[in-house]
């Protein structure tokens, strides 16, 4: 799984189910694929979205700014700055500065995520604010590691508030991961269908999978309900690849 897929998984885990979540999932997919190149339009769209908390908007704004190429002098957005100020708590800012110094020495996505997980969501948001306001610079991978750790802390607190048993791997994040991987698998099937005799069949299976994922994101589902989705998709893909004589390894 590429780290961008992981970022999409974690970010979606903190967004309430509904049509807006499906829309955000599509925007993230487009941004990571390099299809959405107007940061100003994207940020204006984000600013006016209902339902989302200021912090969620701040995190999404941070992700979009990291990913979409922009002019050097492009002004930072106030709604993102306000969301990433750690609630104005000096304690959060002190911890954010300490974390930033550690992240500056880190170069990997997973390393940054591990370091960040020992801090509170407030301190993590403040650290994102430092980077967003150009007061500090880290690699893009490290910044995304910080994003994922923040989302994990938020998802954990949301999960606890649902009074469900907290396990080592958050069910909300596992659920989003299955959804993202199912969507990725559907894409692989569409790509393979290009010049084959079974193209129509593959495209139909992929299309059904995409519709199912879209419906589940829009309607909202319990984390356990997506468990069979990815497995069904992978079985369909494997059966199709077997007929085509294609090695599964290429698409893992």
Swiss-Prot record:
Primary localization class, coarse: virion
Membrane-topology annotation of the record: Peripheral membrane protein
What is one term from the GO cellular component aspect held by the record?
A: host cell nucleus
Q: Which GO terms describe its molecular function?
A: RNA binding; structural constituent of virion
- Region annotated RNP-binding sits at 165-252
Q: Keywords assigned by UniProt?
A: Host nucleus, Membrane, RNA-binding, Viral matrix protein, Virion
Q: Set out the biological process GO terms recorded for this chain's protein.
A: viral budding from plasma membrane
Keyword field contains RNA-binding: yes
Q: Where in the cell is it found?
A: Virion membrane; Host nucleus
Positions of short motif Nuclear localization signal: 101-105
Return the annotated region ranges for Membrane-binding: 1-164
Q: Which domain of life does the UniProt lineage start with? A: Viruses
InterPro entries given in the database record = Flu_matrix_M1 (IPR036039), Flu_matrix_M1_C (IPR013188), Flu_matrix_M1_N (IPR001561), Flu_matrix_M1_N_sub1 (IPR015423), Flu_matrix_M1_N_sub2 (IPR015799), INFV_M1 (IPR037533)
Q: Where is the signal peptide?
A: none
Any extra detail in the entry?
A: Most abundant protein in virion. When expressed alone can form virus-like particles in transfected cells.
Q: Which family does it belong to?
A: Belongs to the influenza viruses Matrix protein M1 family.
Question: What role does this protein play?
Answer: Plays critical roles in virus replication, from virus entry and uncoating to assembly and budding of the virus particle. M1 binding to ribonucleocapsids (RNPs) in nucleus seems to inhibit viral transcription. Interaction of viral NEP with M1-RNP is thought to promote nuclear export of the complex, which is targeted to the virion assembly site at the apical plasma membrane in polarized epithelial cells. Interactions with NA and HA may bring M1, a non-raft-associated protein, into lipid rafts. Forms a continuous shell on the inner side of the lipid bilayer in virion, where it binds the RNP. Determines the virion's shape: spherical or filamentous. Clinical isolates of influenza are characterized by the presence of significant proportion of filamentous virions, whereas after multiple passage on eggs or cell culture, virions have only spherical morphology. Filamentous virions are thought to be important to infect neighboring cells, and spherical virions more suited to spread through aerosol between hosts organisms.
Q: How does it assemble?
A: Homodimer and homomultimer. Interacts with NEP. Binds ribonucleocapsid by both interacting with genomic RNA and NP protein. May interact with HA and NA. Cannot bind NP without genomic RNA.
* HAMAP family for the chain: INFV_M1 (MF_04068)
Q: What is this protein called?
A: Matrix protein 1
Species of the source: Influenza A virus (strain A/X-31 H3N2)
């Amino acid at each position: 799984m590429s780290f961008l897929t992981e970022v999409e998984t974690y970010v979606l885990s903190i967004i309430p189910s509904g049509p807006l979540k499906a829309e955000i999932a599509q925007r993230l997919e487009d941004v990571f694929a390099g299809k959405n190149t107007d940061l100003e339009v994207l940020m204006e769209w984000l600013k006016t979205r209902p339902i989302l908390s200021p912090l969620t908007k701040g995190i999404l704004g941070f992700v979009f700014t990291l990913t979409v190429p922009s002019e050097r002098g492009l002004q930072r957005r106030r709604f993102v700055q306000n969301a990433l100020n750690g609630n104005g708590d000096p304690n959060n800012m002190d911890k954010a500065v300490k974390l930033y110094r550690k992240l500056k020495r880190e170069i990997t996505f997973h390393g940054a995520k591990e370091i960040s997980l020992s801090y509170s969501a407030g301190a993590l948001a403040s650290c994102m604010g430092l980077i967003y306001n150009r007061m500090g610079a880290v690699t893009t991978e490290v910044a995304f590691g910080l994003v994922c750790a923040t989302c994990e802390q938020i998802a954990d607190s949301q999960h606890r508030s649902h009074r469900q048993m907290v396990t080592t791997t958050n069910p909300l994040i596992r659920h989003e991961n299955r959804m993202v991987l199912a969507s990725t698998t559907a894409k692989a099937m569409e790509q393979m269908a290009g010049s084959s005799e079974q193209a129509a069949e593959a495209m139909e299976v992929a299309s059904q999978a995409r519709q199912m994922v879209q419906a589940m994101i829009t309607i909202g589902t319990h984390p356990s309900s997506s468990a069979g989705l990815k497995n069904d998709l992978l079985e369909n893909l494997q059966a199709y690849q077997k007929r085509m004589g294609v090695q599964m390894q290429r698409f893992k």
